[in-house]
């Protein structure tokens, strides 16, 4: 009997050993394991931020476009983004038009800035190694097309006063208005610059007669509505020492409304 008791007591410490091994603390997680475990939480927060921003953007864009939010309650995310892009493009066009109407030099500055940026991109692509040739060609082609569109934009036309002198687009000469005798016909602007009497050779240019002068300059002759349509013309000069010349067939007494003082001169 004592032998059995001694055998049982000697075996009890061995049986308790596995329990002490199982209670050891786990090893700390590595950085990669921590990222993997926290990734679902970060993804959930990111989606919540996106949905919150899209909700605010939907409210703003519907208010800006003056649309009823109750009729557009189920807009997709792509629809909200497309509406926002279109609205911003329209705002950009309006701002550009307003800037051009107040300061016509804005378009010239924009062209100069775009051209400078295009030159810098071209210089970088020509010196940078590792850029695919196809990518370089497509990028430069896109910039060239944009530059052509910008160059095709026109300056806004400014309203001209009836008696104001404006340069002729082809010759750069002042526009001189000759009042006619008929009240229903509006005066036609002509460009003239001449130092002497007209010679015999005359050509038609833009509906007017172009008469070359002996000194190499030109004069435009315009028909007066007070006379018949069979060939009477009135030359207008910009030189103060040259009077208003009439053809031999026209008498000064038949045109009281056209005098030297009635012609506006810029000097």
From Swiss-Prot:
It is found in: Nucleus. Pfam families: Hairy_orange, HLH. Residues 110-143 form the Orange domain. It comes from the Eukaryota. A motif (WRPW motif) lies at residues 264-267. Residues 26-35 have a biased composition (Basic and acidic residues). Residues 10-22 have a biased composition (Low complexity). Its main location: nucleus. Transcriptional repressor of a subset of early mesodermal genes including myod1 and t/bra. Binds DNA on N-box motifs: 5'-CACNAG-3'. Acts as a negative regulator of myogenesis, mediating Notch signaling to repress expression of myod1. This is Transcription factor HES-1-A. It comes from Xenopus laevis.
């Amino acid at each position: 009997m004592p032998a059995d008791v001694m055998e049982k007591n000697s075996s009890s410490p061995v049986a308790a050993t596995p329990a002490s091994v199982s209670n050891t603390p786990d090893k700390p997680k590595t950085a990669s394991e921590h990222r993997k475990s926290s990734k679902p939480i970060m993804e959930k927060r990111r989606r919540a931020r996106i949905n919150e921003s899209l909700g605010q953007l939907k409210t703003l864009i519907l208010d800006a476009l003056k649309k009823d939010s109750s009729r557009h309650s189920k807009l997709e995310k792509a629809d909200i983004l497309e509406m926002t892009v279109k609205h911003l493009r329209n705002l950009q066009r309006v701002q550009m038009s307003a800037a051009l109407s107040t300061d016509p030099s804005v378009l010239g500055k924009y062209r100069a800035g775009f051209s400078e940026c295009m030159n810098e991109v071209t210089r970088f692509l020509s010196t940078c190694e590792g850029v695919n040739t196809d990518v370089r060609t497509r990028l430069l082609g896109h910039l060239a097309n944009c530059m052509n569109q910008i160059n095709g934009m026109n300056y806004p036309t400014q309203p001209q006063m009836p008696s104001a002198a404006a340069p002729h687009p082809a010759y750069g000469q002042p526009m001189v208005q000759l009042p006619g005798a008929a009240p229903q016909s509006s005066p036609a602007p002509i460009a003239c610059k001449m130092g002497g009497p007209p010679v015999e050779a005359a050509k038609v240019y833009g509906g007017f007669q172009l008469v070359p002068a002996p000194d190499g300059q030109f004069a435009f002759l315009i028909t007066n509505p007070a006379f018949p349509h069979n060939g009477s013309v009135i030359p207008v000069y910009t030189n103060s020492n040259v009077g208003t010349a009439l053809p031999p067939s026209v008498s000064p007494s038949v045109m009281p409304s056209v005098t030297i003082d009635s012609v506006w001169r810029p000097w």
